Amino acid sequence: MCAASVYPVSPEAAKHSLTDEAAYRAMYQQSVINPEGFWREQAARLDWIRPFSEVKRTSFDDHHVDIKWFADGTLNVSANCLDRHLAERGDQVAIIWEGDDPSEHREITYRELYQEVCKFANALRGQDVHRGDVVTIYMPMIPEAAVAMLACARIGAIHSVVFGGFSPEALAGRIIDGSSKVVITADQGIRGGKTIALKENVDEALTNPQTRCVQKIIVVRRTGANIRWYPHRDVSYDDLMRVAGEVCAPKEMGAEEPLFILYTSGSTGKPKGVLHTCGGYLLYAALTHERVFDYRPGDIYWCTADIGWITGHSYLIYGPLANGATTLMYEGVPNYPDVTRIARIIDKHRVNILYTAPTAIRAMMAEGPAAMEGADGSSLRLLGTVGEPINPEAWHWYYETVGRSRCPIVDTWWQTETGGILISPLPGATALKPGSATRPLFGVVPGLVDNLGNLLEGPAEGNLVILDSWPGQMRTIYGDHDRFVDTYFKTFRGMYFTGDGARRDEDGYYWITGRVDDVLNVSGHRMGTAEIESALVAHAKVAEAAAVGVPHPLKGQAIYVYVTLVAGTEPSDTLRQELQQWVRHEIGPIAVPDTIQWAPGLPKTRSGKIMRRLLRKIATDDYDTLGDTSTLADPGVVDQLIAAHEAVKQR
């Protein structure tokens, strides 16, 4: 193995972990040579109502993309996360909830969670929610959000969780796309000492006439604030729970019936409703949670992700609960009330496993030793990172300062579409290289291809594809299977195209190099450039806009936007701020451009295509490698943009 900055597996980790190097190699070989046999064996970790006869029926042929796992088997996801644990661990804590305010926390046992879920499942049925209906969940990070997800799964409703930071317009778009019957929300959310007007946002979203599909809003009281109330439509969560029956038999669901829709940004503007199903998704989330995090009974496991993202679905709720784990849910932000909050939570709850994003790590790192000041940290055994590639400097700081140079780091690569982690170290099996996601997990066959789709052998750099299906894979884009095929299977025929670029080194380790399509990764959140551009162009004073990502020390990428104004409109700092507020209103705070540069025009080919490559280079001061600009309709615009960029830097 190449010796540059390699951290070998410690003898202790190899001895005590679930998977050592020999076990990894044997399991991986079986999983790719005999996937049917491997996944049949693994599926025994779930409780099936009707056992399946066929394991795998999948095709990546772009004329007939079809993904089915355990298709004739039946089960219930909620029962697998709750009911089956009651006999042995009913009194074990399932969810530790830590409030935004450090003085607030709750512990909910498996039995208590089961009771709450049964009652709320009955309450949903009382609101005419049934199998196959879509329920939108727009909530803060409170236990009731987990209850809502599991209650939907119990009765066969499809949940669609929308991140609480999204604007009313973005929320409305997701409600309309899924034809949601019910919206579950809270009066307000609390993050970093500030309140978020969730109910007010829902009210505003439902002023869109296309949201008439919504029959009821169920409102959880989080702050007790005065909110507008519409008696014909709004229902109190507490009132429903007060009268709900306590017994709710789990619905027998086909393995391929939908479990949830989760919207993710695409390169074409309209967010994609990624659809995951019951059987394969839960199995993959449970297996990867156990093996990647080397989960052992009794561990306190903390995934810092919001439930509005796939990481919150798979590794805060479904994976841990399917494995009978104790999962910690945190309402707030990493630096509130001060930078020691993460360290304090680790010590307060004796956290053993921490799974967080490079953005949070870089924010702590920026504070220097203060972030871990006075912390004990001795309970930690394993660290994880997710959302974007972690730069080696942040990796080293995380390893040395948070993990005290004794906790392995699992740098995980995966996507909303994959349902679970695809490439990651295993603590007892994989020597670590800072910045590398290392090797594929069981059943995952990655490849690198050039732009013509030719597979590259050995050490190489190219487009990252997956050559065969795995159980956690998304099945379709909700209501738009053609878009699913076009997005993931048409670029490179017979392969799943991830949209990411990667490098494979001489040891077979994978290094993710970032998106190769027009998608940004801001603080670990994917965002389509087209979505931001569409929002800006909807403003009366904007003629054209182009968004690119530029490196940012904390967020990974910052949003840099070139804006061409309507003729006769004068650029000004006031207008710049107005446009930033406009994007905040249209999409949400996470999409607000960090920099807006006024542009006399955009570099376009004669066919009208914007040359984003040039815009990225100008935004990062890379003027020397602009390459041939003679194919542009107006080559002179490049010099104008460079001059304008220099002016932006002087501001």
From Swiss-Prot:
Positions carrying N6-acetyllysine: 609
Cofactor(s) needed: Mg(2+)
Enzyme class: ligase
Pfam families, A to Z: ACAS_N (PF16177), AMP-binding (PF00501), AMP-binding_C (PF13193)
Single GO MF descriptor: acetate-CoA ligase activity
Regions crossing the membrane: none
Top-level taxon in the UniProt lineage: Bacteria
Listed GO biological process terms: acetyl-CoA biosynthetic process from acetate
Gene Ontology cellular-component annotations: cytosol
Catalytic activity: acetate + ATP + CoA = acetyl-CoA + AMP + diphosphate
Free-text description of this protein's post-translational modifications in UniProt: Acetylated. Deacetylation by the SIR2-homolog deacetylase activates the enzyme.
Residues bound to Mg(2+): 537, 539, 542
Keywords: Acetylation, ATP-binding, Ligase, Magnesium, Metal-binding, Nucleotide-binding
EC number(s) recorded for this UniProt protein: 6.2.1.1
Binding site for ATP: 387-389, 411-416, 500, 515, 526
CDD domains found in the cross-reference section: ACS (cd05966)
Record: residues binding CoA: 191-194, 311, 335, 523, 584
General function of this protein: Catalyzes the conversion of acetate into acetyl-CoA (AcCoA), an essential intermediate at the junction of anabolic and catabolic pathways. AcsA undergoes a two-step reaction. In the first half reaction, AcsA combines acetate with ATP to form acetyl-adenylate (AcAMP) intermediate. In the second half reaction, it can then transfer the acetyl group from AcAMP to the sulfhydryl group of CoA, forming the product AcCoA.
Family: Belongs to the ATP-dependent AMP-binding enzyme family.
Stated name of the protein: Acetyl-coenzyme A synthetase
